[in-house]
Regions:
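Solenoid-repeat scaffolds in large eukaryotic assemblies
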Residues: 152-154
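N-terminal alpha-helical signal peptides/signal-anchor transmembrane segments
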Residues: 46-78
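Helix-loop segments that flank and shape redox-cofactor active sites
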Residues: 51, 78-86, 109-116
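Polar/charged heptad-repeat coiled-coil helices used as signal-transmission/dimerization stalks
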Residues: 2-9, 40-58, 91-94, 98, ...
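Extracytoplasmic/periplasmic helical hairpin
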Residues: 70-93
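Extreme N-terminal signal-anchor transmembrane helix of membrane signaling/transducer proteins, especially
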Residues: 14-42, 202-218
Length: 234
């Protein structure tokens, strides 16, 4: 500190003012830099939450719901004898297939675009493969039901085909768990960063105030002390 005082004291008034201006500028730039970095970190975590993990979990939950409805409609088809009701079930099944494909495409797009989401690729592919096997047997199940062979259709649904459905559900649940962990971590990181940023900005602001005040005082003293000494001598 004494060295700084001596250096400032040896400067002319204009130089002293420039030192003060540069100090204020550097400290202000530091504060702005901290704010910018903090904003980028928070924004990154918010994007992960809003564009990756939250929508991914929503799509996975939609897939669970729609595939469950799909299987319910198949069972309804088996127990119905009214042609109109059976046609209605088939229409609903076709509609659900389309919705499942659309939702799956959205989930695929997110997973392809995010490296962390790619970690769930094996479970996702296994779930898709199991669902395709299950869906592939759907036409046969409905055809048997149409022909009045409900017992055979029911046996098919509760046998190997059901194992495919259970495999699909299991992999989907695992994937949901992994994505939920990522979502929770992103939320925690965003909250932690917000607190840290607040502390850093407050601390930096106080540091700027203290440093600029201290240097300003040193400069003021280096200007006024010689004048006071002259006045005292006179």
């Amino acid at each position: 500190m004494e060295k700084i005082k001596k250096c400032i004291a040896n400067l002319k008034v204009e130089g002293k003012l420039k030192v003060y201006q540069m100090t204020v500028l550097v400290m202000t730039l530091f504060l702005v830099l901290v704010a910018l970095i903090s904003t980028v970190v928070i924004r990154s975590n918010i994007e992960k939450i809003t564009k990756v993990w939250s929508p991914s979990l929503e799509y996975l939950q939609d897939l669970e719901t729609m595939t469950a409805k799909y299987r319910i409609k198949q069972y309804q088809h088996l127990v119905e004898s009214d042609a109109a009701v059976m046609n209605s079930c088939e229409e609903e099944i076709t509609k659900l297939e389309s919705q499942i494909q659309d939702t799956d495409a959205k989930l695929e797009a997110i997973m392809s675009a995010n490296s962390k989401a790619q970690k769930g690729r094996d479970d996702y592919d296994a779930a898709n493969a199991a669902w395709e096997k299950y869906r592939g047997a759907s036409d046969e199940i409905l055809q048997l039901s149409r022909e009045g062979k409900q017992q055979e259709a029911s046996k098919l649904m509760t046998g190997e085909v059901y194992e495919d459905y259970k495999s699909f559900s299991k992999k989907l649940t695992i994937l949901c768990g992994k994505f939920q962990v990522e979502l929770d971590q992103a939320k925690t990181m965003a909250n932690v960063c917000t607190v840290i940023i607040f502390i850093v900005i407050v601390a930096a602001g106080l540091a700027i105030a203290v440093v600029t005040t201290l240097i300003g005082k040193i400069i003021t003293n280096s200007i006024t002390e010689p004048v006071e000494q002259i006045d005292a001598a006179v």
